Amino acid sequence: MLISTAIMALDYLLLAVANNIWLFLLARIITGVTSATHSTALAYIADITPEGGRAARFGLIGACFGVGFVLGPAVGELLANLSLQAPFYAAMALAGANFVFGYFVLPESLPAVERRPFDLTRANPLSALNALARMPGLRSPLLVFLIMAIAMNVYATIWAYYGITAFGWSSGTVGLSLAIYGVSFAIGQALLVAPALRILGEDRTVWLGMIFDIVSLVLLGVLTSGLAVLILIPFTALGGVVTPALQAIMSREVNANAQGELQGVLASLNAIAMILSPLVMTWVFARFTTNPDQIFLPGAPFLLAAALMTVAVILYLARSKSRSARPA
């Protein structure tokens, strides 16, 4: 995590001084190759937290993301008034401060006897995925996680286009909608994950949360009022309880020295979803907004995402049923 944080600071420095597209792309490549801060933070949480408390703490990581989702663009816009480079220098300073804090304050999460020696073959995400997928308890959750990630990336992919095309939103209204989502997501992750787990348990939190996501996606697909969509946004963010609960379920299926490997695989699956989802969702969006032979339906990608989430729910419920049917 410290190495990734240090390289993150270097990346922001390169972005600040980049004077051509090639240096900019180099900085982005470096970031992609070393972007392990989030997955290692989750692995660290898994290492130091008893199994029953992991989902709630994973939710707190999600809450931090929600806060950053709101504050990052706002602070970046203010700094950009000083210069285009100022936001990158500020991000470099934050990453550097994070590195210093981690180096001097954060202890190692596992004792030496429980750490696994580095294996280059397991560092390959495909090899790691293959190894984890061979574990019966992880096959179905990993597939559910991937399908869910592809579906939920619809928000990042077409949200701005959807608001502008369907409701004539200005850039300010799009920004407002994103701020509402970020605040709602942070509140949901910080305050709702733990009560949901306590009342429902991890298993029901996952599939009920996914059903909640399906309802939200269908509504976004068919609503014709921009105001109604803005009102719906806080409720769409509540479906965020699914991911920490599902991560906690999967973390119980691996040994203590494989938590980092699991989180790395989940990060790789997220990356795959971030490649596939834009390709599919933008094609569907264009098909239903620019093709005169099709009905005008800007929300079509959300309906596709709802269909994918339905598949994920069916797979997850089938897994739960098969596990409950096993003899004790």
Question: Where is each model-derived feature located?
Answer:
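Structural signature of the two symmetry-related core transmembrane helices
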Residues: 1-14, 204-219
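Helix-breaking motifs and short loop linkers at transmembrane-helix boundaries and internal kinks
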Residues: 17-22, 34, 168, 222-224
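Cytoplasmic helix-loop-helix junction between adjacent transmembrane helices
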Residues: 27-66
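A membrane-interface helix-boundary motif in multi-pass transporters
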Residues: 80-93, 283-307
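Multi-pass alpha-helical transporter architecture, strongest
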Residues: 99-105, 303-328
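Juxtamembrane intracellular "pre-TM" segments in multi-pass secondary transporters
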Residues: 107-144, 166
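Short amphipathic helix-loop junctions that connect adjacent transmembrane helices
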Residues: 157-174
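Helix-to-loop junctions at the C-terminal end of transmembrane segments
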Residues: 188-202
